[in-house]
Amino acid sequence: MSERESLNSQLEHLQMRYVGTGHADISKHEWLTNQHRDSLSSFIGHSSFLSLFSIAENESVGRVRYNTLTKMISPCGPAPKIKDNTMDKEEKND
């Protein structure tokens, strides 16, 4: 197996195993959501970030952690509506 095929198979394995590693058909919204969730989880994992944010927001560290966790549910808002082209074609034929 050539080096290129090996790299492609390793990439496919990572994409199947871990959420957020992306794929060829990923949408912009999905990619941004993964980026925001990665950042927010990093903030939660580092206590110095939580301390900094708690001082800046004048909140307790626990409250900042809770607020950050709730932001992770939908960090970029709802997904945009996808326009279905098949309905447009059917409407034009009628």
UniProtKB/Swiss-Prot annotation:
GO term, biological process aspect, one: mRNA splicing, via spliceosome
Disulfide-linked positions: none
Gene Ontology CC terms, in alphabetical order: nucleus; precatalytic spliceosome; U2 snRNP; U2-type precatalytic spliceosome
Keyword presence, Translocase: no
Keywords: mRNA processing, mRNA splicing, Nucleus, Spliceosome
Pfam families noted in UniProt: SF3b10
Location in the cell: Nucleus
Biased composition annotated in UniProt, kind: Basic and acidic residues: 81-94
Region described as Disordered: spans on this chain: 75-94
Oligomer status and interactors: Component of the spliceosome B complex. Component of splicing factor SF3B complex which is composed of at least eight subunits. SF3B associates with the splicing factor SF3A and a 12S RNA unit to form the U2 small nuclear ribonucleoproteins complex (U2 snRNP).
Described function: Involved in pre-mRNA splicing as a component of the splicing factor SF3B complex, a constituent of the spliceosome. SF3B complex is required for 'A' complex assembly formed by the stable binding of U2 snRNP to the branchpoint sequence (BPS) in pre-mRNA. Sequence independent binding of SF3A/SF3B complex upstream of the branch site is essential, it may anchor U2 snRNP to the pre-mRNA.
Family membership noted in the UniProt record: Belongs to the SF3B5 family.
Protein's recorded name: Splicing factor 3B subunit 5
Highest classification ranks of the organism: Eukaryota, Amoebozoa, Evosea, Eumycetozoa, Dictyostelia
Gene designation per UniProt: sf3b5
